Amino acid sequence: MQILLANPRGFCAGVDRAISIVENALAIYGAPIYVRHEVVHNRYVVDSLRKRGAIFIEQISEVPDGAILIFSAHGVSQAVRNEAKSRDLTVFDATCPLVTKVHMEVARASRRGEESILIGHAGHPEVEGTMGQYSNPEGGMYLVESPEDVWTLNVKNEGKLSFMTQTTLSVDDTSDVIDALRKRFPKIVGPRKDDICYATTNRQEAVRALAEQADVVLVVGSKNSSNSNRLAELAQRMGRTAFLIDDAADIQEAWVKEAACVGVTAGASAPDILVQNVIARLREFGGGEAVTLEGREENIVFEVPKELRVDVREVE
């Protein structure tokens, strides 16, 4: 059995930054550190940080006065930000800069009284945070998930209308929704640069290349990870059997027993150690040496807040 690895896969710059913010805060200030929502959607990462003293909460009211609070990589609404500001808290923002870019687009539309449409998945924390940047009652903020949603949507003024997207969506599905928006509202204005982030796009391109060669595709990522789910769905659309797994222990030998080639990738919030564990598990089932496919190089780095720019090893 051949083992192929997608390239790129795993951590993106936004996830790296968010985890570093929590790790550095723990090193500098000591436990406990409070984090609103899971800092990234990966069980292994969250459990590891929890063991080191991070406390994950959903409501600001759960945080005691004088504590350190970190916003997750998914971002928060302006209401949450204001609530935290009203408290005696030290706040660090781990929102991915590419999510912040979308927040700024929505806030700009709100200030102008223009209506905005967000393409995204209802209930996802990134969507809640992005929708929560809009506050102008003269305009309006709407959420759509599919072309069908677009055709039933009514707005106040089609001449002052813009759209944005969640950063972790399926590129293909989003393209279909954008096409519907442009047909339904010919004057709608989109972002100058695509809101779907580079890491989401690159990992979807990589899983396409992987699925062209593999019989079975394993996507390492947690069930609540939007970008990981999109990778598994894309492989399935290409006619491959695909499984979304948290770690190597999830793999059943029956999944790969008849496969000549198994492809492995990982969502943007999944650490490489989980991929290495999957490779080891597949080798127990008769797999050979893992081969990494050629792919797009990524060299983007997002800085942590200056107060947290410290070599953790020096603190420890």
UniProtKB/Swiss-Prot annotation:
> Which InterPro entries does this chain map to?
LytB/IspH (IPR003451)
Positions contributing to [4Fe-4S] cluster binding: C12, C96, C197
Enumerate the residues binding dimethylallyl diphosphate: H41, H74, H124, S225, S226, N227, S269
Catalysed reactions listed for this entry: isopentenyl diphosphate + 2 oxidized [2Fe-2S]-[ferredoxin] + H2O = (2E)-4-hydroxy-3-methylbut-2-enyl diphosphate + 2 reduced [2Fe-2S]-[ferredoxin] + 2 H(+); dimethylallyl diphosphate + 2 oxidized [2Fe-2S]-[ferredoxin] + H2O = (2E)-4-hydroxy-3-methylbut-2-enyl diphosphate + 2 reduced [2Fe-2S]-[ferredoxin] + 2 H(+)
At which positions is (2E)-4-hydroxy-3-methylbut-2-enyl diphosphate bound?
Answer: H41, H74, H124, T167, S225, S226, N227, S269
From which domain of life does this come? Bacteria
Which cysteine residues pair off into disulfide bonds? none
Which residues lie in coiled coils?
none
Q: How is the cofactor bound?
A: Binds 1 [4Fe-4S] cluster per subunit.
In the Enzyme Commission scheme, what number(s) does this protein have?
1.17.7.4
Q: Any idea which residues are catalytic in this one?
A: E126 (proton donor)
The entry's cellular-component GO terms read: cytosol
Q: Which cofactor(s) are needed, names only?
A: [4Fe-4S] cluster
Q: What pathway is it annotated to? A: Isoprenoid biosynthesis; dimethylallyl diphosphate biosynthesis; dimethylallyl diphosphate from (2E)-4-hydroxy-3-methylbutenyl diphosphate: step 1/1; Isoprenoid biosynthesis; isopentenyl diphosphate biosynthesis via DXP pathway; isopentenyl diphosphate from 1-deoxy-D-xylulose 5-phosphate: step 6/6
Please tell me which top-level EC class this enzyme sits in: oxidoreductase
Instruction: Give binding positions for isopentenyl diphosphate.
Output: H41, H74, H124, S225, S226, N227, S269
Assembly behavior: Homodimer.
Q: Write out the similarity annotation.
A: Belongs to the IspH family.
Q: Protein name, please? A: 4-hydroxy-3-methylbut-2-enyl diphosphate reductase
Q: Give the source species.
A: Salmonella typhimurium (strain LT2 / SGSC1412 / ATCC 700720)
